[in-house]
């Protein structure tokens, strides 16, 4: 058979890119300047890679938006290239980056626990990548939040559909939900986990409620970048 990643790649030739760009442009027109002069009007989840640079360039330089960037650190040593890339995206486009640096003690315990029990050593950080930007978008009142590619859809995985909304990215199979009971124990208590980290455990009910209260949230759908 043919893998899902190859099928999805072939389907790209059927995409009306002009129509998709107009759809994206309409979202930008809707939210541009929504928080007043100098206020952030959109947000981007960034790592410093190819998706991050393209999205920020598109929003800032082409669409003349004022994005705020959210990033999650993993407490691992970064390569010089990685350090440069993250710095470059802020310096070249003149954007503020707010980073979440997880509790190192809790991360060590949870990485070992989830590796031994589920074979998912980076689950704790992966989950934060898909929850922290949503949480911060609610705080900054920026309902237009852009993520990069759905790795499960693009490269093969359990998700066989294109995720239209940034809120659905968490369903791509990379960081499935676990109950809070799986996070605490072995020396890790709820007090060891910040509110943002604790939200990585439950089913994000509280977080989704906060997002749905944002002004003019577009039916829980985020813009797709062309």
Q: Which residues fall in each region the model found?
A:
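Nucleotide-activated chemistry modules centered on ATP-dependent adenylation/adenylyltransferase
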Residues: 2-43, 58-226
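Short, glycine-rich nucleotide/cofactor-binding loops
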Residues: 42-51
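Hydrophobic alpha-helical hairpins/lids featuring a short glycine-rich hinge
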Residues: 53-57
């Amino acid at each position: 058979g043919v893998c899902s990643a190859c099928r999805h790649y072939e389907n790209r030739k059927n995409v009306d890119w002009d129509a998709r760009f107009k759809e994206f442009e309409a979202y930008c027109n809707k939210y541009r300047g929504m928080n007043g002069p100098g206020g952030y009007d959109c947000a981007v989840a960034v790592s410093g890679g190819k998706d991050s640079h393209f999205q920020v360039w598109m929003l800032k330089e082409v669409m003349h938006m004022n994005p705020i960037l959210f990033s999650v650190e993993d407490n691992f040593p970064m390569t010089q290239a990685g350090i440069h890339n993250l710095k470059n995206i802020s310096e070249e486009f003149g954007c503020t980056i707010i980073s979440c640096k997880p509790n190192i003690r809790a991360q060590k315990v949870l990485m070992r626990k989830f590796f031994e029990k589920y074979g998912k050593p980076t689950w704790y950080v992966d989950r934060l990548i898909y929850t922290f930007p949503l949480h911060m978008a609610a705080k900054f009142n920026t309902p237009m939040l852009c993520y990069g590619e759905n790795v499960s859809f693009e490269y093969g995985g359990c998700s066989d559909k294109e995720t239209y909304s940034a809120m659905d990215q968490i369903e791509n199979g990379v960081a499935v939900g676990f109950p809070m009971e799986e996070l605490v124990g072995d020396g890790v208590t709820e007090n060891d986990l910040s509110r943002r980290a604790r939200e990585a455990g439950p089913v994000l009910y509280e977080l989704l409620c906060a997002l749905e209260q944002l002004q003019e949230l577009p039916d829980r759908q985020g813009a797709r970048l062309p």
